A protein has these predicted regions:
Chain B
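Polar helix-capping/helix-linker motif
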Residues: 12, 72, 350-351
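Low-complexity, Gly/Pro-rich coil/beta segments used as flexible assembly/activation regions
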Residues: 53, 57-111, 232, 248, ...
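N-terminal leader/signal peptides at the extreme start of proteins
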Residues: 1-14
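Eukaryote-specific, low-hydrophobicity, charge-rich regions
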Residues: 246-276
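Short, ordered "entry" segments at domain starts
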Residues: 101-240, 245, 270-377
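Aliphatic-rich helix starts adjacent to a transmembrane/signal segment
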Residues: 16-58
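Charged, amphipathic alpha-helical interaction segments
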Residues: 20, 39-40, 44, 64-67, ...
Length: 286, 377
């Protein structure tokens, strides 16, 4: 039997050229589809992540500013105004830090009752924080009611109230004992500023304790152009530049992604931007 | 033989399509799940913010509810005594819990926890708020036992004194400051055996006694009235009790509280802490009996005899007294055209009676400044 002769039932080993070409075409087409799908999904993934990050920045930024400003006290015509300076992209104010009730006062010390009536994210800090103690010599009259600002002259110490319960002893000076009912309201505050600050070439919402040490620290960002916009309104809803007249604050935060995101249409270099606006009602304004 | 060859041929023709497809599906599924996770995180963040806001609103409702439904019983809670109130649902998924702590000088600290509940009733968000409150004591310009915008005429055998005097047998009164006997925008005229004494005895032609000195506290207190009585005659005011165990009967319009204290006879102790604000939009004639608190009369007040009252009397019309046995311990303010105190009455200035009448009868309001507090517990 000649070697070149193939019987009808001889097994067919290998592929024909057409089969190979067909297989390669199918392979390339499938691989291209998979690659395109992966690219698409990767873009979607990155865009979604950037958008989520930008929105989280917006939410946390606006909540931070709103929470800080909501508790601000303001009295039209002056008096007990906690807004010290107001601008379109910064605000300086007394930020409330602790609250509770006194259990003992003397000329140079205020003891704050610890326990469930005391509230604060951190302990008072000397110099940086100040005391606000409610004075009301004549409880039958509101005309002498006032929060008296006193310095904190030493680190607060653990102590006891006259009844033996735990207290926080805060050193101060210039307190006129007869002006206070004990127990009575007490607060602490620090002078704060919120403003735009730059770090690593990016803009952030920064916070700085003006009564403490240290500079402006970025807390939320990155923000886009005009990242923090504040409009101050009086009781009639008109914008005002007088701190004591402010009743509401319109707050706009504009966020920006960390890096450019390729758009689904193929565009390159677009930075995701988003914004959130809300109105903060000053709960202690009158 | 032929079947074996065909099987071998099929094995040889296996391609990469299935493997590639599986790999592609896995990669795509991973990417989709990544996007899904990112979206879930974003949505969870948004939901969290909404729930936190709802919890805050529940806490706000708790603050407002306490002020709207203030009970004068809170005014006498023990100092430092935390008073926790039952939790209240706000809508289908909100809840607040209040704790009220009394301080001195008529001040309170209200703490409220607001919860947002999930479908199974579990807490999914909590916020804490607080508010400093004070008793809504109106600004009362009391510088004398009797304050009148018009002239004061004292006759008969009356005794008006501005020296601070506690009601008989009352205990726990802080020392007060002596005031004038009578203070008037016109003249104070005493006839017969009448006596007007104090520090000073009289303040006459006081131009500061304008309408608002009388109408401002009148209108404020009127809004907190315990008893609103039509104009007319009222006789024999007596403290009464009801129920078992017995308690002061606030539903009885002739029960104006118990000013007497032991060892006086017939003291109704259940009503010693009852200081009603009695308001009449018309004119009143009162005759015999006793009471305490704040008496507000928009018209004229005529006290005819044997009527004892501890607290504050504000009359926007004229005040006239007659007969014997009348006694007011506290302060009287009259804006009307004439004040004629004749017969055999006594009017004693009492800082203690004034303070108790106010502190036991008024509701609370937020401190004027820095009352609202964001708390962490």
């Amino acid at each position: 039997m000649p070697l070149t002769t193939r019987s009808a039932d001889h097994p067919r080993a290998g592929f024909t050229l057409v089969e190979m070409l067909l297989a390669m075409i199918i392979f390339v087409a499938t691989a291209s589809l998979i690659y395109a799908s992966m690219r698409l999904m990767e873009k979607v993934h990155r865009t979604g992540g950037e958008r989520a990050g930008a929105q989280i920045t917006l939410r946390s930024g606006s909540q931070t500013v709103a929470a800080e400003l909501r508790e601000v006290n303001n009295v039209d015509g002056g008096g007990m105004s906690d807004l010290i300076a107001i601008n379109g992209n910064s605000v300086t104010y007394w930020a409330m830090r602790n609250s509770g009730m006194t259990c003992q006062v003397s000329n140079n010390e205020v003891r704050i009752k610890k326990g469930p009536t005391y509230s604060g994210y951190r302990l008072p800090i000397m110099i940086r924080d100040s005391l606000l103690v409610f004075a009301d010599r004549d409880s039958l009259s509101v005309t002498d009611d006032q929060w008296v600002q006193l310095p904190i002259l030493g680190p607060p110490q653990n102590s006891t109230c006259p009844d033996g319960s735990p207290a926080l002893a805060v050193g101060t000076a210039g307190l006129v004992v007869a002006d206070y009912h004990v127990p009575g309201p007490v607060r602490t505050f620090e002078l704060m500023q919120l403003a735009i600050t730059t770090s690593g070439g990016r803009q952030y919402l920064g916070a700085q304790s003006l009564s403490g040490s240290g500079g402006m620290e970025p807390v939320v960002g990155p923000l886009g152009a005009g990242g923090l916009q504040l409009v101050y309104r009086n009781q009639f809803g008109a914008s005002t530049t007088t701190p004591s007249s402010v009743r509401t604050i319109d707050l706009t935060v504009r966020s920006q992604g960390y890096r450019p995101v390729t758009t689904l249409g193929g565009g390159v270099g677009a930075m995701l931007r988003d914004s959130l606006a809300l109105r903060v009602l000053l709960r202690n304004a009158r | 033989m032929r079947r074996a060859r065909l099987t071998a041929l099929r094995r040889d023709e296996r391609g990469l399509a299935l493997v590639l497809s599986l790999i592609a599906m896995v990669v795509i599924a991973a990417l989709i799940s990544g996007v899904f996770v990112a979206s879930r995180q974003e949505m969870a963040g948004g939901r969290s913010a909404v729930r936190a806001t709802q919890a805050t609103e529940a806490a706000e409702a708790g603050l407002n509810d306490m002020l709207a439904n203030w009970s004068v019983a809170y005014n006498t809670y023990g100092i430092y005594g935390d008073s926790a109130f039952p939790s209240v649902m706000v809508g289908p998924s909100g809840r607040y819990s209040q704790v009220l702590t009394r301080m001195r000088g008529g001040k309170f600290l209200l703490r409220v926890r607001g919860d947002q509940l999930g479908a199974s009733g579990n807490v999914i968000a909590t916020r804490y708020l607080g508010r400093y409150l004070r008793l809504a004591i109106p600004d009362l310009d009391i510088q004398a036992a009797v304050t009148a915008q018009d002239g004061v005429t004292a006759g008969g055998n009356i005794d008006i004194t501005g020296f601070d005097t506690n009601p008989p047998n009352w205990t726990g009164c802080a020392p007060g400051i002596n005031k004038a006997g009578a203070r008037s925008g016109q003249a104070v005229t005493a006839h017969g055996a009448s006596s007007v004494i104090g520090s000073p005895a009289e303040i006459e032609f006081d131009s500061t006694l304008v309408d608002s000195v009388f109408t401002s506290p009148f209108n404020t207190l009127k809004g907190m009235a315990t008893l609103t009585l039509p104009g007319g005659s009222y006789t024999g005011m007596t403290p009464t009790v009801t129920g078992s165990p017995s308690r002061c009967n606030g539903a009885n319009t002739l029960n104006w509280g118990e000013p007497f204290a032991a060892p006086a006879a017939g003291v109704v102790t259940q009503c010693q802490g009852y200081f009603p604000i009695i308001y009449s939009p018309g004119s009143m004639v009162v005759n015999t009996g006793r009471g305490q608190g704040i008496l507000l009369v928009a018209g004229d007040l005529n006290i005819q005899g044997n009527f004892i009252f501890d607290g504050i009397v504000i009359v926007l019309g004229s005040l006239q007294t007659a007969g014997t046995g009348n006694k007011v311990t506290g302060a009287v303010l009259t804006a009307g055209q004439s004040v004629s105190i004749v017969g055999n009455p006594d009017v004693f200035y009492s800082s203690c009676a004034i303070a108790r009448a106010l502190q036991y009868s008024v509701r609370a309001e937020p401190l004027r400044d820095r009352s609202w507090v964001q708390r962490v517990n």
